[in-house]
Amino acid sequence: MSCPFFIVKKTAISIIFCTFASMKMKRLFLLFLLVVMANVSALAQYDFLTAHRGVIKGGYDFWVYQPEDYYYSQEHTPVVIFLHGASLCGRDINRSRRYGPLDAIVRGREIPALVIVPQNPGGSWNPKKVLDVLDWTRQHYPCDSTRVYVLGMSLGGYGTMDFAGTYPDRVAAALAMCGGSTLRDVQPLGQVPLWIIHGTADRAVNVRESKKVVSALEAEHNDSRLRYDWWQGANHGAPARVFYLKKTYEWLFSHSLADEGRPLNRTISIDRSELKNAYTDMMKNAPKPEVIDGEEDEL
């Protein structure tokens, strides 16, 4: 008696039965197949948001978002790291979902990437701790290590430039808004396609903080991968809607560590006037990701 074969695909399911000796065996096989199909469907049709607490000794707690098609893409999936601002610091990991990519996903923005969101308990972002989160995620979630991106605003803008400048060989592109850098030497940022956005009327973080980075890179003729926008009259919170724009992620995803010379994409632009329509093309009735609590024991 030959064996049964079954092929399960996302768009179609083909079932080829061999001849069974009894109807009972056939019914048992049908039951087994239904269970398998249900499990594959559960993996393939839903996106997940998992909280990981205490998995890195002395490190950050963090969220990992798995996109809907992750079951199929896995090692081809890009990674987006979001570093939040000071207003979201604290021990409650849910604070980091108040704005940014995770909130955009809940509102209906499709982001086809693993999205990593560390929770900063307070103080400046620590680049090594962010790297620890990235490395832990790579060990537990197959992904494309040549397409790792980081973005953030305010304190997260500082964290974005500090992380990209500390590990330029790990970051395919970075987007830093209304921040600056605490690095003594910002020249390694010249290796990374970097987009800086800052409002000229920012009273929380003066635009001079971003301009210092730009001036330092330009002074060394190290700005071929740098672009920047000074939004006239924009306050500190104005750039927040950038996280909700589709083209933000299109710009990030257009870069790869595998690109020869690592050129900067200057084709995709974001005009301040676009922010008012940041939510208009979202999938309003899209199901929200399933939220899962992760491990709580330290490694």
Regions found by a protein language model. Name each.
Residues P4, I15, T19, A42-V79, ...:
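A domain-start/cap signature at the N-terminus of enzymes
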Residues R170-S181:
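A conserved short beta-strand
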